[in-house]
Structures are given as structure tokens and as C-alpha cells.
Amino acid sequence: MDARRTNQETTGMAFNFRSFSVQKLASIAPRYLPFADVASEDVPLARLLRLSLFQVTVGMALVLLVGTLNRVMIVELAVPATLVAGMLALPLVFAPFRTFIGYKSDTHVSALGWKRVPFIWKGTLYQFGGFAIMPFALLVLSGYGEAVDAPRWIGLSSAALAFLLVGAGAHIVQTTGLALATDLVDEEDHPKVVGLMYVMLLLGMVVAALIYGALLENYTPGRLIQVIQGTAVVTVGLNLFAIWKQESRNRARAAEMENVIQPTFRQAWTSLVARPGMMRILVIIALGTFGFGMADVLLEPYGAQALGLSVAETTRLTALLAAGTLVGFGVASHLLGAGGSPMRLGRVGALIGIPGFVAIVLSPGLVGTPLFLLGIFATGIGAGLFGHATLTATIRAAPSNQTGLSLGAWGAVQASCAGVGVALAGLVRDILVGIEALNGIQAHTPYNIVFMIEIGFL
């Protein structure tokens, strides 16, 4: 009896400590975490933070693909930057479907009354499948162990499939997860809750970049495989925990939706773009995404080839960029909360990005690494201001019954332009490298020309 009582007391202490930790985090967060004031008694901050874990898994995937694997494939595995950029742009194939995914989740009919959760789970499985294929593709590309005699095209095609699955899964999870977050709060709080989700995305990217950098301090192909496999398991675990009991079962709602005549996708899309200012907002998002996004595929190789940074050091660049973006989101939260104009704030973000890229371009010939890091941080701030401003403008311009569709449209334009920008950046870099071999220009010149193109877009 005494042993049982002791066990119960121990269990109770553990439970109380866990509850205390969550409550303490929820009490501290409103003071320091942008958009944390969106929480209410019905939807406490602890619940929103738990839901936001789906953004953490998306951030992990972005860091791994755009940061670590991008540099490893170009520098260590000697894969042409055009091929790597093409692989990173493969999720572009799925990006336009974000609008359709948002529409389907708005109108989805389920026996349990769920709208968003089934799509989040499907996206999670896609991500896991991509991460499951990726290690073996990289083994073939690296010629590691028995893969030394395997045809190189097998590694390239398998890596492309893995990138596509991870990207498609991230698109599905992010679009429907953001829509689920808006379902939980009042309509006037939609921009805040989406902003909170993106803050958690950036925090996830920072933490993931630091962890990946530490794990890959002594890089080997085998260690990279372990990191990817661990990411696959963590992704499934975090997403399951994130969606657990977030969307209530409602059979009455399911029966009601079966009797409602839903508009077709074409009708819904026509209605959305007919809203005043919506097309202008989407065009601005496209230009700004080109301006900030083309550098994603080049920053890590640029740091390695122009400044001699290691794998661990270039992986941490993603953390610095995300930290700058987080600062931008925080400033945007304060200014928009005070009644600032989203479009005016978006212009300020674009203007801040210009000197950031100028600093990156000048870094090899002047101060070197410190100026390079300062430029990355500045572009992160500009991207954060621009991203939150355009996101808020998009949500405010859309009707309340088309939240998923509007978020899908914003994500589709952003992701599509980011994918095209990444592919163009790699292509331009490779073409200029060929010219470099003829004219003997410096190694960082092809990268700098791409950065100047981005300045033009901004």
C-alpha cells in the first residue's frame, strides 16, 4: 500500500511539474512571443503552441533541404548547382495546388466532421516517405560503401523523388494546419494566429539549424543519414502531438455539409480574385518572393566557396536568417497592432532587404564573414516584415468562409515564385561559372550577379 501511495505521489508530482511547465511557458510567452495575445480562455496559448508544432516540422524540412543538403550536394558531392536547384524547386510542381488544398479543406465532408486533420495526416505521411527514401539516394550519390558501383542516375532520380515528397507533404501540412489554426479563433484574430504559427516556424528553423549544425560538426555521409532518419521520426511524432484533439468530432456538422451545395473550385477562385485589391496583393507577393527567395539555394555554397565556411558554419546561416526574419515578424506585429498599413510595411521590408544584399555582395572584398552575416540578418528582417505584411493583407482582403482558399492562394504564389526563383538562381550561377572558366573571374562573382538580380526585384 505504501509503495502504491509513493508511486501515485511520484506520478502526481511528475504530472504537476509538466502542467506547471506548460502554464509557466504560456504565462511568459505573451510578453515575449509576437502574436501570443491571440490566446483566450476557450483557446489557451498552450493549445495553440502545441498546434504550432506542425510548423516546427515544416521548418525542420526547410533547414534540412535548403540549408544542409543544398550545400552538401553542391560542395561535398559535386552535384551541379542546376540539378540541386532543380531538386529544391521540385516542390514547385505541387505549390500551385496549395490553393486547391485550401479549397478542399474548406469544403471537405467527413463522417466525423473533420475538415483539416485528414489533410494534415496525409501531408505528414508524404513527408515521412520522402525522408525514408532520401538517405539511400544520398548514399548512392556519395558512392558510400557498396553504393560505389551504383549508377549515378539512380541516386539523382531517387533524391528528386524524395525532395518532391517532402515538399508536397510540407505544402499540405502547412496550408491545412494554418486553416485549422484560424478555425480555432475569432475572425478578427485570424492574422494574429497565422502570425503566431509563422513565428513558431521561424523558431523551429533556428533550433533545427543549430541542432543540425552541432550534429554535423564532424561531417560524414553516415552521420548525415542518421540525421535524416531522425528527422523523419520526429516529424511524425510532433505532427501527431500537434493535431491531437485539436479538431472536435461533429457528426451533425458532417450531415449538414452533405446537404449543402458547395461552390466549385473555379467559382470559389473567381469570387476570391474579384475582391478589391486581391490580385494586386498577389502580384506584390510574387515580386517580393523572387527578391528574397532566389538567395536560398546560394547562401550556403557562397559561404563555403567565397568565405571558406565549414558545413556546420553554413548550416547555422539558416538560423541567422530565421532569427532576422523573427525580428521582422515581431516588429510587424507591433506596428500592425498599432494600426499600421500592411502594404506600406511590406514596402519598408523590401527596402530593408536591398542594403542587406549589398552587404552580402561586398563581403568577400571588404570585412569578410562579419559583413556577410550582417547582410544575411538584414535580409531576414526585411523578409519578415514583407512576409507578415502581405499575409495580413491577404487575409483581410478575403471573406471569412474562404480562409483556407486565401491562405492557399498566398502560399501557392509564395511557394511557386520561391521555387522558380531557386531554379533560376542555380541556372544563372552555373551558366556564369562556365563563363568564369573562360574569363578567369573570381569564384564569388556568379553568386553576386544573382544577388544583384534580387535587388532589382525588390
Predicted regions mapped to residue ranges:
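Helix-to-loop junctions at the C-terminal end of transmembrane segments
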Residues: P96-G113, L216, G328-R344
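Loop-to-transmembrane helix entry/capping segments in MFS-fold secondary transporters
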Residues: A81-T82, L156-S157, E187-L196, V311-A312, ...
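Intracellular loop-helix junctions on the cytosolic face of multi-pass helical membrane proteins
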Residues: M1-A46, D149-A162, I172-L178, L184-A286, ...
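C-terminal transmembrane helical hairpin of 12-TM major facilitator-type secondary transporters
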Residues: G346-T390
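C-terminal ends and interior cores of transmembrane alpha-helices
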Residues: I120-R152, L351-V367
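Short amphipathic helix-loop junctions that connect adjacent transmembrane helices
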Residues: G67-L83, V297-T314
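Intracellular juxtamembrane helix-capping segments at the cytosolic ends
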Residues: I172-V185, L385-P399
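Glycine-rich segments within core transmembrane alpha-helices of 12-TM secondary carriers
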Residues: F94-R98, Q127, P191-L216, G411-A425
